[in-house]
Amino acid sequence: MKFFAVFALCVASVSAANLDAIAKPGFPAGRIINGHEADKGEAPFIVSLKAGKGHFCGGSIIAENWVLTAGHCLIFDEFEIVAGLHSRNDESDVQIRKVTGKHQQIVHEKYGGGVGPNDIGLIYVDKPFNLNALTRDGTAAVAKVNLPTGKYESTGKGKLYGWGLDNSGFSPNILNTLDVDIIGYEECKNALNSDDPLDPVNICSYTAGAIDGACNGDSGGPMVRITPDGTELVGIVSWGYQPCASTTMPSVYTWTSAFDKWIEDSIKNYAQLL
């Protein structure tokens, strides 16, 4: 029987013994299968969303006051945004911003909750991120990622980033990354079942027959493409088939290019309320 679930919380590998336990709708651990440690400073735009002491979603800095994430991640009234985090054991270069209520959060008005289209949200931070700060070794601690301009294709070779559990079930200290093949809506639709909740506002990562093309990344985390003009945020981790360890189905992302006007209008409208 097939089940859908929104990617959640972390990057993990699940043993065969655990498959039955997670084969149900919900928010199981997301994962980067066959990934590797990212270089320090490789993804200065990624943030960790934390409630209490726990990481629950990823996100991306798109401006000094704004973070872009998945709509399904915005479930808490209060949480922290941790930027500049590379190693869990070293927070010397991080910038922490507090979210104190729903007034700082914008979820797309057509997102219906759970698995489905329009899974996108914005977070406003009162204290801007310092985008000019450098780490002790001279790398950029925190930076924004570019939104797609339309100059470059959203499909092709891409990269994912995220934290979470490793193959042994322990939390890795270092940010993880994975190279992926990004495909468009039509190709993804052909690879999924006809009744799957895929929409033209989605793109996917997929390598036919490969498990590492499924269930990747932190919910809300970035899928990017490296262009001659810099790194572009082309997708936001949204949902995929469960159980992850046995599926070769595509992973599904919110396609950021489909929401460029929504992002622009939401930021402008929010500014009028300040």
Curated annotation (Swiss-Prot):
Keywords (A to Z) from UniProt: Disulfide bond, Hydrolase, Protease, Secreted, Serine protease, Signal
Disulfide bridge positions per record: C57-C73, C188-C204, C215-C244
Chief place of localization: secreted
Cellular localisation: Secreted
Class of this enzyme: hydrolase
Gene3D superfamilies in the record: Trypsin-like serine proteases
UniProt xrefs under SMART domains: Tryp_SPc
Annotated active site: H72 (charge relay system), D119 (charge relay system), S219 (charge relay system)
Tissues where this protein is expressed: Expressed in the midgut.
Record's note on what induces expression: By blood meal.
Biological process annotations from GO: proteolysis
Enzyme Commission number, as recorded: 3.4.21.-
Classification via InterPro entries: Peptidase_S1 (IPR050430), Peptidase_S1_PA (IPR009003), Peptidase_S1_PA_chymotrypsin (IPR043504), Peptidase_S1A (IPR001314), Trypsin_dom (IPR001254), TRYPSIN_HIS (IPR018114), TRYPSIN_SER (IPR033116)
GO cellular component: extracellular region
Matches recorded under SUPFAM superfamilies: Trypsin-like serine proteases
Family from the record: Belongs to the peptidase S1 family.
Annotated function: Protein with lectin and protease activity involved in the establishment of trypanosome infections in tsetse flies. Binds D-glucosamine and agglutinates bloodstream-form trypanosomes and rabbit red blood cells. Capable of inducing transformation of bloodstream-form trypanosomes into procyclic (midgut) forms in vitro.
Protein name according to UniProt: Lectizyme
Organism: Glossina fuscipes fuscipes
